[in-house]
Amino acid sequence: MDIEAYYQRIGYKNPRNKLDLESLTDIFQHQIRTVPYENLSIHCGESMELDLEAIFDQIVRRNRGGWCLQVNYLLYWALTTTGFETTMLGGFVYGSNNDKYSTGMIHLIVQVTINGRNYIVDAGFGRSYQMWQPVELISGKDQPQVPSIFRLREEGETWYLDQIRRQQHVPDQEFLNSELLEKKIYQKLYCFTLQPRTIEEFESANTYLQESPSSVFLDKSICSLQTPEGVHCLVGLTLTSRTYNYKENTDLVEFKVLTEEEVEGVLKTIFNISLGKKLVSKNGHLSFTI
C-alpha cells in the first residue's frame, strides 16, 4: 500500500513532514470531503471487508467510500504511516430510539497526540453528525465547528461525545416531518474509553453490522459526503443537501426523491463514486437521521 496513492485519492498536496494540528486538520478535512461514508456494498450483494489491504483497494484504488470501521481504519493507517502518534479506540453508539448506548463496541475512533495534547479524529460518523476538525480531549469544553458545537464530557473512565445543533429550515413542506430529520438540538453521539484497541476487536462488530436484522446498515442503503458548505446524504431514494448556517443559527435542508434510474448518476456526480454491481436502494423501517 502506497501512502502517496492515499494522498492522491483525497487530493492532499501539502507537505507531509509537519506533524502539527494544522496539518492533521487539513488531512482530515481532505478525507471527509472525498471519501463518502457509505454502506452500498451490502446493497450490491457484497460484504464490507475489514482487512486493510481490501479497504485500501476499495477506497483508494476503486474510489469508493466505506463505513466507520473502514474509513477510520484507513485514516488510522495513513496518519500512523505519515508519522503521527496515534491510538485506535472503540466507541459505543447512542441510540435515540431506546436512549441507550450500544452494548457492543461498534465504532472505531482515532486518537492523535500532538505536543502532549490528545485529539479525537473521527471521519466515520457521517451525515450532519460528522466533525470537521479534531476534537480536543477536554471534558466540558464547548468546541464550535462549522457543523455544530461538539462537547466531550468525562465520567469516571468513560468519555461521552455530544453535539449541540442548530435549528433547520426545510423549504419543501412535504418533508417537514420527515423521519430522516434530527429533531433534537442537543444530541448524544457515542461514548468511549481510552483503552487502546486492535482491529481484531472490531471483527465481530463488522459481521454484526452487516448481518443482524436489527442493524440499520442492513435496513438502509446510505451514502453521505461532506462538502465545503455542508453535507449530501442519500438514504434509499431520498437525497438531502444540507447547507450549514445558511442564515443565523439555522441550517438549510433540501430534499429530493430520486427514481431508481437517477441513482447511478447522482452517485457519480454528487458523491463521485461508481459501483461495479447493481445497487438495490433500500430505506426500511429502522430509525436513522441525517
Curated annotation (Swiss-Prot):
**Any one annotated GO CC term:** cytoplasm
Compartment list? Cytoplasm
Q: Tell me how the protein is altered or processed after translation.
A: The N-terminus is blocked.
What highest taxon heads this organism's lineage? Eukaryota
The answer to whether UniProt assigns keyword Glycosyltransferase to this entry is no
What's the source species for this entry?
A: Oryctolagus cuniculus (Rabbit)
Q: Where does CoA bind?
A: 103-104, 208, 214, 287
Give the signal sequence positions. none
Query: So what does this thing catalyse?
Result: an arylamine + acetyl-CoA = an N-acetylarylamine + CoA; an N-hydroxyarylamine + acetyl-CoA = an N-acetoxyarylamine + CoA
Tell me, what does this protein do in biology? Catalyzes the N- or O-acetylation of various arylamine and heterocyclic amine substrates, and participates in the detoxification of a plethora of hydrazine and arylamine drugs.
EC assignment: 2.3.1.5, 2.3.1.118
Q: What is this protein called?
A: Arylamine N-acetyltransferase 2
| InterPro entries, sorted | Arylamine_N-AcTrfase, Arylamine_NAT_domain_sf, Papain-like_cys_pep_sf
Q: Which keywords does UniProt give here?
A: Acyltransferase, Cytoplasm, Transferase
Q: Per the record, a Pfam family?
A: Acetyltransf_2
Q: Which residues form the active site?
A: 68, 107, 122
Q: Which residues bind substrate?
A: 106-107
